């Protein structure tokens, strides 16, 4: 019992130290005037599995995250609708140096864990590991107050809406992506410090098209 307690303390301290190695990334203000028209973006949308090794430009990352689930009104409502405005979808950005949680109110990336977890997102599908970043979508079931099947269904719908925003925004911004359900759930759940009331549902590797 004592040994288990001290092991937990050591692990927690290790996670805190890892997160402290990273800094908050304050994103640029989103450029809401750029990108192609909605109909053109929908026409261009496609699933892409080959990515350039080029790092995502800061403005592209900022605009993509805002389009996916950013705040677009003074009352704090989002670009993606959600069940009863629960705003239950969390976006984790997995970069080579570490994983971050997107804070929509601050329009910033908050450090979660240092280290490259793109392999855990790829989970054996090598093409996904070649993307310079992946966005992992998680449903926060505490917003529903229960883990019923109907609540999980609504949460999955909310995640799907954010995922579609990512797909369309990538098409409009000249980025490449593909929505995926495959990922190493156990590794990511530990790395991202997700409680049992968080559902890991979808991920989107993102990069520039290889060609």
Enumerate the predicted regions with their spans:
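Short secondary-structure capping/junction motifs at helix and strand boundaries
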Residues: 2-4, 16, 75-77, 175-176
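N-terminal amphipathic, basic helical "cap/leader" segment at the start of enzyme domains
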Residues: 20-131
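Short, flexible beta-strand-to-coil junctions
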Residues: 95-97, 140, 206
């Amino acid at each position: 019992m004592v040994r288990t307690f001290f092991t937990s303390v050591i692990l927690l301290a290790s996670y805190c130290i890892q997160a402290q190695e990273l800094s908050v990334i304050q994103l640029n203000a989103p450029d809401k005037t750029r990108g192609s028209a909605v109909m053109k973006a929908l026409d261009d949308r496609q699933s892409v599995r080959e990515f350039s090794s080029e790092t995502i430009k800061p403005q592209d990352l900022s605009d993509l995250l805002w389009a996916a689930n950013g705040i677009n009104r003074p009352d704090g409502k989002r670009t993606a609708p959600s069940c009863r405005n629960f705003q239950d979808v969390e976006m984790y950005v997995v970069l080579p140096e570490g994983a971050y949680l997107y804070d929509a109110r601050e329009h910033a990336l908050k450090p979660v864990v240092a280290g490259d977890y793109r392999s855990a997102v790829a989970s054996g599908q090598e093409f996904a590991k070649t993307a310079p970043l992946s966005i992992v979508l998680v449903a926060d079931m505490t917003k529903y107050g229960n883990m019923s099947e109907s609540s999980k269904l609504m949460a999955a719908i909310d995640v799907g809406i954010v995922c579609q925003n990512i797909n369309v925004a990538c098409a409009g911004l000249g980025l490449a992506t593909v929505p995926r359900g495959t990922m190493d759930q156990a590794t990511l759940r530990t790395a991202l410090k997700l409680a049992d009331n968080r559902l890991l549902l979808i991920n989107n590797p993102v990069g520039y098209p290889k060609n």
